[in-house]
């Protein structure tokens, strides 16, 4: 099981940091998904799977749109990645990474 409050704190911090950047469509998509996950994580039966989807989404959208996660943003994303590892090996094959509707 993951620490929901700590995870929400990381999501909140990453959201606030990204909102300080130029508001490109990709940044707005990522922050929208961060907000959806933040609101939904308390009621999830397996929140680590949701975090796994979130991290994959951020990496794929970031890569496709040449968004660089440096400094604290990189640290926060790595922390979320560490949390997402608790989802197990097969969770990454169960979703279309770029589809916002999975959140």
Language model features by range: what are they?
Residues 65-103:
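Amphipathic alpha-helical binding modules
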């Amino acid at each position: 099981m993951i620490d929901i409050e700590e995870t929400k704190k990381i999501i909140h911090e990453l959201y606030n940091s990204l909102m300080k950047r130029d508001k490109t469509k990709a940044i707005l998509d990522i922050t929208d998904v961060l907000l959806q996950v933040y609101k939904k994580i308390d009621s999830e039966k397996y929140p680590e799977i949701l975090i796994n989807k979130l991290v994959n989404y951020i990496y794929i959208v970031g890569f496709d749109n040449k968004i660089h996660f440096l400094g604290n943003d990189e640290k926060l994303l790595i922390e979320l990645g560490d949390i997402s590892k608790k989802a197990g090996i097969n969770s990454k094959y169960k979703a279309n990474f770029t589809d916002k509707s999975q959140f």
